[in-house]
UniProtKB/Swiss-Prot annotation:
InterPro entries: V_ATPase_D. This is A-type ATP synthase subunit D. The keyword DNA-binding does not apply. Component of the A-type ATP synthase that produces ATP from ADP in the presence of a proton gradient across the membrane.
Amino acid sequence: MAQEMIEGINPTRMELLKLKQREKLAVKGYSLLKEKRNALIMEFFNILERVKGSREKVEEHLKEAFSDLTEAQVLMGDTAVERAAMSVRESVEVDIDSRSIMGVVVPVVDARATQRTVVERGYGLVDTSVKLDEAARKFEESLALIIELGEIEKTIRLLAGEIESTKRRVNALEHIIIPRLKNTVKYIEMRLEEMERENFVRLKMIKKSMEME
């Protein structure tokens, strides 16, 4: 593959200058893409470390929430808990924004609105238990953590895709484009040198022929 050249190139000085400029730009682009790839990989693993912690938090909060819910059912009865649950506002609003990581647009989700006061939840205070309030709070916290985890996992997928794309471009420059440019430049330089030698010999022969006349 390293011996391949760019096809359809005329061995002229103008073409040589153009190819050298292309080679220079390709080498610079290769260097910049390598820096981008390395920075993306570093960011990828930094974010990946957060995933395990986020999942553990979600599991812990859900476990506590279900424990409180079970206690509330024992204290209030299943029917009262279901009635309270039916009166809670179902829809939850979140703010979704975005940010850029090395040119990769990733989501930023603000899930603070998932956590509400007892009044905002909508169920009555007279016939409910404190344990139900605690269960509701922990479920809301769990929801916020789940949304945060989704944001992290989406970011990881987007970064992984960009890393793979950047790797392919780096490999193409390193193993195909730059070697072909270098080989073509070398070929043109050799051809120009040959043409100069041929012209020199031709001129020498013409001069000798003229001197013999």
